[in-house]
Regions:
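Rhodanese-like catalytic fold shared by cysteine-dependent sulfurtransferases
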Residues: 1-21, 29-64, 71-108
Length: 108
């Protein structure tokens, strides 16, 4: 299914995550370089072929999606549902909420 989760809940999901869980960052490469969740896969929401890039991902594994504040990721979930993905959660408040919760961010 598809849901929105708090940063703390997202951290709990990651701590107990199945190996196939994919963390998906839908921000720009510049934003990603400034700091992202460890192991996150980058697909830029603003790319003209964003939907095509999403469509190349495995629809049968679970996803944890985030952006800066929750706006882009919130728009990404309905698109993933249309593309036939089975399960995705969106971090409410994005990486800003994640950072505010004191959770780890990796630069580079």
């Amino acid at each position: 299914g598809f849901s929105t989760v708090s940063a703390d809940d997202a951290a709990a999901v990651l701590a107990d995550a199945p190996d196939e869980l994919v963390v998906l960052d839908v921000r720009t490469p510049e934003e990603y370089a400034e700091g992202h969740l460890e192991g996150a896969v980058l697909v830029d929401f603003y790319d003209a072929d964003f939907a095509d890039q999403l469509g190349e991902l495995d629809p049968d594994v679970p996803y944890l999606v985030y952006c800066r504040s929750g706006n882009r990721s919130g728009q990404t979930l309905p698109l993933m549902e249309q593309l036939g993905f089975g399960s995705a959660s969106d971090i409410d408040g994005g990486i800003l909420a994640w950072a505010d919760a004191g959770l780890p961010i990796v630069a580079g």
